């Protein structure tokens, strides 16, 4: 299941990565703050739609264990960075298949977040409890949680079918993230962070 989703979304994934600040830019206060603000606004629109999609409870995935929006909110507060004034419209996530596809994007970002965390923690003085909660993700359990997500998606598709609809949901979420990051003002320079003491 995960390889099929990776293949279906490869082009969008590459374009999103190209739009995001580089690792070196993220290790600078303004770049890190801008990325947090952009991701916070995206999750604020997409997470509620994913978790409230009709039939999503049947996936067995637990919202309280996987929501990233509270982590992003905590990071912004800890670093004294205001959320973006720009907002995304609520997306249309019509069913569990589309929600699984979108969650593939949101959960997959956790893997990349671990790489970012290791690169920026020292230069920025962030920790999992001060400004780095989102990028720290599930910590040492990140790989295990990713595999568990993949197994839940595979199991759901084996019962309900609709692998093509899951892939379409992932493509839709990636396309929305791509469009959001390309929106003027979304990744503009943010106020500098207060370095951890």
Task: Give residue spans per PLM region.
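Metal- and O2-centered redox machinery and metal/ROS homeostasis
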Residues: 1-197
């Amino acid at each position: 299941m995960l390889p099929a989703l990776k293949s279906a979304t490869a082009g969008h994934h590459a374009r999103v990565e190209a739009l995001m600040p580089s690792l070196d830019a993220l290790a600078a206060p303004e770049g890190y703050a801008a990325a947090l603000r952009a991701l916070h606004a995206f999750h604020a629109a997409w997470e509620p739609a994913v978790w409230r999609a009709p039939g999503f409870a049947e996936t067995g995935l637990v919202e309280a264990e996987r929501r990233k929006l509270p982590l992003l909110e905590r990071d912004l507060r800890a670093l004294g960075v205001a959320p973006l004034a720009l907002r995304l419209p609520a997306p249309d996530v019509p069913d569990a298949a589309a929600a699984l596809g979108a969650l593939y994007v949101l959960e997959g970002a956790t893997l990349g977040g671990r790489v970012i965390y290791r690169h920026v923690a020292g230069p920025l003085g962030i920790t999992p409890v001060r400004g780095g909660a989102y990028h720290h993700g599930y910590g040492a359990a990140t790989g295990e949680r990713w595999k568990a997500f993949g197994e839940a998606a595979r199991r759901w598709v084996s019962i309900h079918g609709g692998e093509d609809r899951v892939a379409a949901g992932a493509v839709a979420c990636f396309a929305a993230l791509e469009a959001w990051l390309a929106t003027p003002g979304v990744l503009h320079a943010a106020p500098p962070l207060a370095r951890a003491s």
